[in-house]
Amino acid sequence: MSFKLNSFVAAALFTSLCATSLPALAADPAAALAALQNNVQSLGPNGEKPESASTITLSDTELAKIKAMNATAAIVFHYTGNDWAKAQTAGLKAQFAKMGIKVIGVTDAGFKPEKQVADIETMLAQKPSIIVSIPADPAATASAYKAAAAQGVKLVFMDNVPKGMQAGKDYVSVVSADNYGNGVAAAHLMAQALKSEGDIGIVFHAADFFVTRQRYDAFKKTIKETYPKINIVAEQGIGGPDFTGDADKAASAMLTSHRKIKGIWAVWDGPAEGVIAAARTAGRDDLVITTIDLGENVAIDMARGGFVKGLGAQRPYDQGVTEALLAGYGLLGKAAPPYVALPALPVTKKNLIDAWQTVYRVPATNKIKSSMR
């Protein structure tokens, strides 16, 4: 899971732009899913058009210059307790090592803005050349990031940018998965599993979190505009920090109040685990769940032929590599695109093993492999 960006205003702008600039989606879920992997549908937090991550490169000469700088980097997370953050860290560290850049710290704010501000201040005391980060709150953390920029630190952001900061001036760039595209993918996967009809529920993130808002907007818009026989009959927001437990309660209430519900979408894999728990408790072995983010627990459920029939996956390892390369752009004073994105990856049981390798750059875990039926 990745998250947090500007505001619902930015999200609304994004949704409006998508409505006018994107082609109409196909009514056939399989065809629509195939098309998703060839383009990025998300726009940046300020409406920027995406630049492909494949265009971000450094020459041998540029790498040599960076190595001679003996630069250091800090990685400041909003939260590290998931596979997404671990893969991001792995990608960042691997690419930084190739660039001769030492990682001096990785921090976890536990989704608390005040903790992240303290983490930034702690890292700044060590005078890093680079900070790669995802803000826990775009407004509450902005002053700390501005202080880092004023100190001359090269900032690269994951998914989200602090309020009042400008690309090319205050930070190098922001790198994101195609979160809107992954929301679209989850909608088509839901339709595919339900044969394009039935009642469904939505468990969304009840916070000013641009990335999760993109997912929600995309899922809901795609269902409403593309599948007229699928009815969204219940929606419930969750605020955390126990997202799995909150989703369990939300889904349980939906299953009790709307007994004809055939499917529930959860905004990322942690909440999806809560929906799985609710379905088990309710004895709803027929419930279809789709989500976003390829975590091990939802992958195991999918491998077993369980509740999770499909999900949209990010590419966090490659995202980390791209962020490290862009940090190199910052050190060199090389012009960088303001928003860089990686395409969505629809995942079902059929391509699960290969998708895990694509997402994490390591083979699927033994638990996943042994769960395949």
Q: Positions of the model-derived regions?
A:
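A residue-level marker of the well-folded mature domains of exported/periplasmic proteins
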Residues: K4, L25-R373
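Gram-negative bacterial Sec-dependent N-terminal signal peptides
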Residues: M1-L25
